[in-house]
Curated annotation (Swiss-Prot):
Induction details: Positively coregulated with aaeB and aaeX by AaeR.
Summary of the function given for this chain in its UniProt record: Forms an efflux pump with AaeB.
Keyword Aminoacyl-tRNA synthetase tagged: no
Name listed for the protein in its UniProt record: p-hydroxybenzoic acid efflux pump subunit AaeA
GO MF annotation terms: transmembrane transporter activity
Length: 310
């Protein structure tokens, strides 16, 4: 009898442990697959593609690749003598037409004052027409001068904002054309995270919700807030025009093919250049408040660890 009871007890304990293990695994799996999180996230930042507005030989490069620069700092300079001569020529034209306009204005004023008693109406009208023509030529010369001055100013390419120079591909002595990208500037204090959430997890994502960001290969957890959710995406397999919307390739996970939607996350603190734009991270949306790790159950902690491998 005692032997039977011991066998039943062991069987019951084993059964209870199996049930508890199944429940634990099931809860961890549900939390792992259905909670709002993703490993497909990227650090991003505002990037300015810097291109000159004038063409010419590069005479001086004042920065090096990946250098932190300040707004207004000179990046490189394009050969200036050609534009200085163009400005001098334009200023000479303005001076010439200014003198000529003054002469024609005096002539027209004199003829208008004398009137038809001293000369014909045709001669008076002709003087007025010549004056208007010279004034138009003066205005054109002034516009050409202003444009030449602007071109000369733009031979010096400056940083439009504080940030890091990256992908610098210009060198002294090279000829650069107007509008060709010379360098990219990653603007300082503009870093954010784009988390590509599966559509099945968007129910737990709302603007204002808190988020945890773990950069790949780091144990450091950054805090942030959901800033916005993309209003539309297009499927990469679609033949229709995306009309400017983000094109996201769907990942095949098990047998479900869920579309992913970009979620923009505003960082509480800027990481500077520690994690460059384009690097990956894991993002967990914790809800309206930050997650209190001290209150996490064993199952929840295990689910968080599973994310590092899934």
């Amino acid at each position: 009898m005692k032997t039977l009871i011991r066998k039943l007890t062991r069987t019951a304990i084993t059964l209870v442990l199996v049930i508890l293990a199944f429940i634990a695994i099931f809860r961890a799996w549900v939390y792992y697959t259905e909670s709002p999180w993703t490993r497909d996230a990227r650090f991003s930042a505002d990037v300015v593609a810097i291109a000159p507005d004038v063409a010419g030989l590069i005479t001086n490069v004042n920065v090096h690749d990946n250098q932190l620069v300040k707004k207004g700092q000179v990046l490189f300079t394009i050969d200036q003598p050609r534009y200085q001569k163009a400005l001098a020529e334009a200023e000479a034209d303005v001076a010439y037409y200014s003198v000529l306009a003054q002469e024609k204005r005096q002539e027209a004023s004199r003829r208008n004052r004398l009137g038809v008693q001293a000369m014909s109406r045709e001669e008076i009208d002709q003087a007025n027409n010549v004056l208007q023509t010279v004034l138009h030529q003066l205005a054109k010369a002034q516009a050409t001068r202003d444009l030449a001055k602007l071109d000369l100013e733009r031979t010096v390419i400056r940083a439009p904002a504080d940030g890091w120079v990256t992908n610098l591909n210009v060198y002294t002595g090279e000829f650069i054309t107007r509008g060709s990208t010379a360098v990219a500037l990653v603007k300082q204090n503009t870093f954010y995270v784009l988390a590509y959430m599966e559509e099945t997890k968007l129910e737990g994502v709302r603007p204002g919700y808190r988020a945890e960001i773990t950069p790949l290969g780091s144990n450091r957890v950054l805090k942030g807030t959901v800033d916005s959710i993309a209003a539309g995406v297009t499927n990469a397999s679609s033949t229709r025009d995306a009309k400017g919307m983000a094109t996201i390739d769907s990942n095949l996970e098990w047998v479900r093919l869920a579309q992913r939607v970009p979620v923009r996350i505003r960082l509480d603190a800027q990481p500077e250049n520690l994690w460059p734009a384009g690097t990956t991270a894991t993002v967990v949306v914790t809800g309206k408040d930050d997650r209190d790790e001290s209150q996490d159950s064993f199952f929840r902690k295990m689910a968080h660890r599973l994310r590092e491998f899934g």
